[in-house]
Amino acid sequence: MNKSVIGTKQMVVSPHYLASQAGNRILDKGGNAFDAAVAVSACLAVVYPHMTGLGGDSFWLTFHQETKAVKVYNGSGRSGKNVTRDVYKGKSAIPLRGIDSAITVPGMVDSWDAVLKEYGRLSLADVLEPARDYAQNGFPVSADQCRHTEKNIELLASTPYTADIFTRRGKAPVPGERFVQKELADSLNLIAEKGRSAFYEGDLAQRIVSHLQNNGSYMTIDDFKAHRGEWAAPVSSDYRGYSVYQAPPNSQGFTGLLTLNILENYDFTQIEHGSFEYYHVLVEALKKSFLDRDAVLTDPAFADIPLERLLDKRYAKQLAEEIGYLAIPAESRPVGSDTAYAAVIDADGNAVSFIQSLYFEFGSAVTAGDTGILLQNRGSFFSLDENHVNTLEPRKRTFHTLMPAMVCKGGKPKILYGTQGGEGQPQTQTAIITRMLDYGMHPQQAISEPRWVWGRTWGEEYEGLRVEGRFTDKTIQKLKDSGHLVEVVGDYDPLMGQAAAIKVDEEGFLQGGADPRGDGAAVGI
C-alpha cells in the first residue's frame, strides 16, 4: 500500500485500473502522452460513470517536451444564452439535480479534439477504441460505483433512462457484475467517426438538446454550436525552489498556490509530520485561501480577478502571520466531489495532468434520452444573487473546482498530482505536495498517509474537520483543544477522495502512486 510503482519509460495513473491499463496500451502502440491521456479520459467516462462522463467538463495541464511549453486547456462549458436568473424566479438557489441543474454545455469532448489536434499522433477513433470496447462489451462494475449507486438509489431509480442504465430494477448492481452501456457505445462510435462536430453540431447534439427541451430546459442547439474551449497560460508560483503550475480561473487552481505561498513561511523541518502542528497549520492556511477564493472566483470574462495581488508572497506572509493556535471559524459552500484525476508521462518526457467531472456523483442524474450520456450539474453552483461574484448570467462559466497540478524544476516536470474531492481538492493536493517536497515521501506514501477534509463536500452541509481513524489520539485531542470540530471517520475513508501522482526521480525513473481508498492503479513500464 505504501510502495510506488516504478517505470523506466512511461507511467499512467488514474482512479480506475482499466483506464490506466488502456492508457498504457496506447503508449505501447506508438501514441504519446497526449494520445494516452485522451484514451484514459474516455475510458473513465465509461468505467467510472458515476464520477465523470461525456456530459461533463475537464481541465488539462500539459507539458510538451519539444517546445518545453506548459499550457492549460480549459474544457469547461458555459451556461445557455437563455438561462438567466429570471428562469429561477421564486427560488433561492438553482436545484442541485434534474433538468434545471443541467444548464451548462459539456466541455470534455471538445477538449479531446483540442488536445489531439495540438499534440497527438493518433486519430480520435484510435484513442477512443478502448472506451468503445468497455462500453459495448462491459466491464466489472467497481465497488465505488456500487456504493454511490446505493447512496443515490432513490434519485437514480426515479429518473427515466438513468434508471435503466445505472440500476437493476431499482437496486444497485453488485461489485464485479458486468456493466454494459450499449447506447453510450453508439455515441462514442459516432464521435469516433465524425469527431467533435457530432457532439456539438450533429446528431448527438440534436438528440441531447431535444431531450432537454422536451423536459422544460432553456438550453438550445446554438449553445452547443457556440461552445469552444481554449488554450491558456497556467498560473504559477514557486515553492521550495520548485515551479508549481495550476489551471487559471475559472478553475480554483490559484487556491492551491496561495496555500503553498502561506506555508512557505513555515519551517517544516521543525514540524513533525502527522503532528497537531502539521495538520493545524495546513487546515488554517487553506481556510485563508478559501476566503479569498470565494470572494473573487468566477468566469474571468465577467469579472477582474486580482491574481497578482493574491499570489504576491508578501500577501501570503501577512496571512501566515494571522494563523495562531486557535482554529478560525469559517464557512464553506457545499460542493460536489464526483471527479476523476489522472496523469501520464511518456518516454519522450511529454506530460499531461488532467481532471474531469460531472460535479456531483451522477451529475444532474439526467441522461440525455437514448444517447447514454449523463449530463453534469455544474451550473447549479452559480448563485442567484445578482450581487454575488459568481451570479448566473448567460454564456458564463461558473466557479470550477477542477484543478490539475504540475511541479517543474529546471524546465521539466518533476511531479504531476491531483485528486477527486471538490472542496477537498486543494486540501489533498496540499497534503500530497508538502509530504513529497517537505518530508521526502514518494508518491504512494504521500497519498496513503492519513488524510483529512475540512468543510462541506459531497454536497453535504458540514462545518467540521473530518479526519481518518489513523490520526493519533494525541493529535486528535490537540485539534479539538484548539477549536477544531473534529469527526473521526474510517481509516481509509472514501470521503477523502481518490488521489494520484507521478514523480520523476533524480535518475529519471518514474514513480507512480494511486489511492488505496478506491479502484485506481499506477501502470508503468
From Swiss-Prot:
Catalytic activity, reaction form: an N-terminal (5-L-glutamyl)-[peptide] + an alpha-amino acid = 5-L-glutamyl amino acid + an N-terminal L-alpha-aminoacyl-[peptide]; glutathione + H2O = L-cysteinylglycine + L-glutamate; an S-substituted glutathione + H2O = an S-substituted L-cysteinylglycine + L-glutamate
Keywords: Acyltransferase, Hydrolase, Protease, Transferase, Zymogen
Keyword Acyltransferase part of the UniProt annotation: yes
Assigned EC number: 2.3.2.2, 3.4.19.13
Disruption phenotype: Grows normally with glutathione as a sulfur source.
GO molecular function: glutathione hydrolase activity; leukotriene C4 gamma-glutamyl transferase activity
Induction: Positively regulated by TnrA under nitrogen-limited conditions.
Coiled coil (UniProt feature): none
Cross-referenced Pfam families: G_glu_transpept (PF01019)
Record flagged with keyword Transmembrane: no
Active site: T339
Disulfide bridges in this chain: none
Miscellaneous: Is not involved in the utilization of extracellular glutathione as a sulfur source.
Similarity field: Belongs to the gamma-glutamyltransferase family.
Assembly and oligomerization: This enzyme consists of two polypeptide chains, which are synthesized from a single polypeptide.
Protein's name according to its UniProt entry: Glutathione hydrolase-like YwrD proenzyme
Lineage summary: Bacteria, Bacillati, Bacillota, Bacilli, Bacillales
Gene: ywrD
